[in-house]
Amino acid sequence: MKLKFIAPLMLLGMMAACQGGKQEANSEQSTETADTTLLEVNFGSKVPDDFYFVEYVNPRFAFHCEYPSFLDKGEAPANGDGRVFSNNELVITVYGEYDELGNADIKKAFAAAKSKTDTLQTQADNWYKICGNDNHGNTYCRKVVEVDGAFATVLATYPTHFANSYAPIVNKVMDTLSPLTPSEE
C-alpha cells in the first residue's frame, strides 16, 4: 500500500519535543494514522517534501511493516532474515529471529531488553516497544512482535537533533509492524 505524505506540520514537532520522562504501560496503546496524515519534515534532514510508505513483507517469519519510500533498500540476506533501509541519517532494520529456547515469551524479552537510557517502555500481549537516546547523540526505537514462536523486530535509529522530522515517520513504521494474516501468507 502506498500512502502520500505532505509536509510540514509544526504541532507534531512540538509534541515530539515535549515527550521526555520515562513512561511505562502494560496495556496496548495504538495510534492509527489516517491516509491524509501531515508530517513535519525537512529541518536539515534528508526527508523529501513528498513521500509515501512501501510495504515490506517477510515470508520466512510471517510479518510485514511499511517503510518510507525515500530510504535506500539494502540487499536481502540469503537466509531471508530481514532488510535494512537507510539514508545515512535514518536507519531502519527489520528482521525476524527464532527464539532459541522455543518458548517465545514477550514479557521475558521485554524485561531483558529494558535499559536505563530508555525514555519509553510499552508492553502489550504480543509486543513491546522501547525508545530512548544513546550516548552518541542518537535516538533509538525498537518494536518487537511475537509471531508463532519467533520475534519480528523493527529497530530505528536517527540523530536526535532530527527528531522533529523522523519521530513521526518511525512511529508510523512501528505502528505497521504486525504478523501476516493467513490470507496474506
Located regions from the model:
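Coil residues (strongly favoring Ser/Thr
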Residues: 35-37, 119, 176
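Conserved polar/disulfide-associated segments of primarily extracytoplasmic proteins
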Residues: 74-168
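C-terminal motif of bacterial Sec signal peptides marking the signal peptidase cleavage site
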Residues: 14-17
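Proline-anchored loop/turn motifs at beta-strand termini and strand-loop-strand connectors
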Residues: 60-76
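Short, low-complexity, disordered segments immediately C-terminal to signal peptides
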Residues: 19-42
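Positively charged n-region of N-terminal signal peptides that target proteins for export
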Residues: 1-5
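Short, compositionally biased strand/turn segments
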Residues: 34-57, 185
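Short, low-complexity, Pro/Ser/Thr/Gly-rich segments in the mature regions of secreted, periplasmic
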Residues: 171-185
